[in-house]
Amino acid sequence: MSKNKKWLIVAISLILVGCITFTFVMARLDWDFLKLGTSKYRTQTYDITETFSDISIENNTADILFVLANDGKCRVVCYDNEKIEYQTGVSNGKLNIKPIDNRKWFEHIGINFESSRITIYLPEKELGNLFVKNSTGDIKLEKLSINSADFSVSTGKIFASDITCAGDFKTKVSTGEVFLLSTKCKNLISSGNTGDITLKNVIAQEEFSIRRSTGDIEFEACDSNNIFIKTDTGDVEGSLLSSKVFIAKTDTGSIEVPKTTTGGKCEIITDTGDIEIDIKQ
């Protein structure tokens, strides 16, 4: 038997042993991959008894969810690494939430299949100003009336549905995506690099201002008095509810916009991306 065949037999044998060992271990764990994680997680609940209108959250990896409380009591429920605590409290009418990471540097190294999350249970659906700064975690809120929103993420997603915002609704992403559904606001202001933005049934009283580098911009049945959209290589595609005076510019992409001459201004600028807009009747 040649030397190469011997090495091949050894390699195949090791692979088979590895597969058998993996199958045995996972069977003992009921095929629950979460049990392979090297970090321990726990749930921490913080009852908020003081009244507030504004919320400020600074976080890194945890998903952030805003939920209406069934019992009318406000609380913050955090599911995270057991060595991460959360500083919560109300100051000057603002609920502040911030993580305190007690891990040493080497404790950041390991296998982890868990997802951290912060759930804010709200006693009522009317709030003041929301400020959330996140990194890889998502931000999700539904069925709320707020004064203003200022959300920023790096790679996480921003999802908002059935929101009434009296003031500005701001989002900022790096590679993360933005999804806004059935939302009304005074101004929609969104900036980002490669992250896409998708809007459906979003109405801004005054202006849309959307900027992206390579991210695509899509909207359906949306409208605003004035619209400004700027992207470098991303495409712009969507439908509006009313006529606009269109100013569309692209270097190498194609342009398809209605030839309407009434309504507010809709300016769309892209370098290599395509522009395709229509008016939904």
Where are these regions (language model features)?
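Acidic (Asp/Glu) and glycine-rich low-complexity loops/linkers
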Residues: 2-134, 140-153, 159-173, 179-191, ...
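Acidic (E/D-rich), amphipathic helical modules within compact regulatory domains
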Residues: 195
